[in-house]
Regions:
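Domain-level signature for soluble enzymes in the chorismate/prephenate branch of the shikimate pathway
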Residues: 1-263
Length: 263
């Protein structure tokens, strides 16, 4: 878990237990399924980069975890290198695809000739730079990663805009407790011609559409997994959950409240 992910979890459950990193999102989810961890945190969507599709795919593939919370964090991206490095030294910049996308304008202006290297996460990029000891390689990651991996901050706020935010899902092997949950996330696995009808059924149940993303279903052309998030500001009711679960192509991934940390 990188510094952004750990930050999102402390908003969800401040002071809870021990937070430890995993190399990949599937690894983190597997630990939850195996009972080795109570929760996992995965980024779901970014203001600039859109849906974090490879992480969403990992969530869809596992039927034994539930979304029990959502946290929205303001994102500040930082360029960091080994101790003693300077911006003039940098020839390669590594980060997650989202980190590279979010810093594209800054990189074009300040390091236009630097190559980029995509990593599994921004935290993995920071760790890679630290282990390399190479002054010519830098990472783009959250500011806390510099302290975590003993790196030097070379430039701050390299993201395109201060409006940059990321939504994180909190996952658990235990379904969320019943109560005043305001949001629901579901996956509809169907042909493209069917999704409009499903959206109508969701609307008729009294739920408002928040986001929808599609991913290829993988077995035939024209079939997709649609990840749909809906809300009811007054609280999602048991009846609404029953209606959604009765739609043949739909699997409910979880009901939850959403929390947002201000910059």
């Amino acid at each position: 878990m990188g510094s952004l992910l750990s930050g999102s979890f402390t908003v969800f459950l401040p002071g809870y237990g021990i937070i430890f990193p995993k190399a990949t999102v599937p690894d983190a989810i597997a630990d939850v399924v195996a009972g080795n961890a109570d929760f996992a945190v995965i980024p779901q969507e970014n203001t600039l980069g859109g849906a974090v599709t490879n992480y969403v795919d990992a969530l869809i593939a596992e039927e034994n975890v539930f979304v029990v919370g959502e946290v929205i964090l303001p994102i500040s991206q930082t360029l960091m290198g080994v101790q003693g490095a300077s911006i003039e030294d940098i020839r390669v910049i590594c980060s997650h695809a989202q980190g590279l996308a979010q810093s594209s304008e800054w990189r074009k202006e300040h390091l236009p000739d630097a190559d980029t290297q995509e990593m599994a996460s921004t935290a993995a990029a920071a760790n890679y730079v630290a282990e390399s000891g190479d002054r010519t390689i830098a990472a783009i990651a959250a500011p806390g990663a510099a302290e975590l991996y003993g790196l030097s901050i070379l430039a701050e706020n390299v993201q395109i805009t201060d409006a940059n935010k990321t939504r994180f899902y909190i996952l658990s092997a235990t379904p969320p407790e019943e109560g005043s949950q305001t949001h629901m996330v579901l996956v509809a696995s169907c042909e493209a011609s069917r999704i409009d009808d499903i959206i109508v059924e969701i609307h008729n149940a009294g739920l408002e559409l928040v986001t929808i993303h599609d991913r290829p279903e993988g077995s035939r052309l024209g079939a997709y997994h649609y990840i749909v998030e809906v809300e009811n500001g007054n609280g999602i009711t048991d009846k609404q959950i029953e209606i959604i679960k009765a739609i043949p192509e739909v699997r409910v991934l979880g009901c939850f409240k959403t929390m947002e940390k201000q910059r």
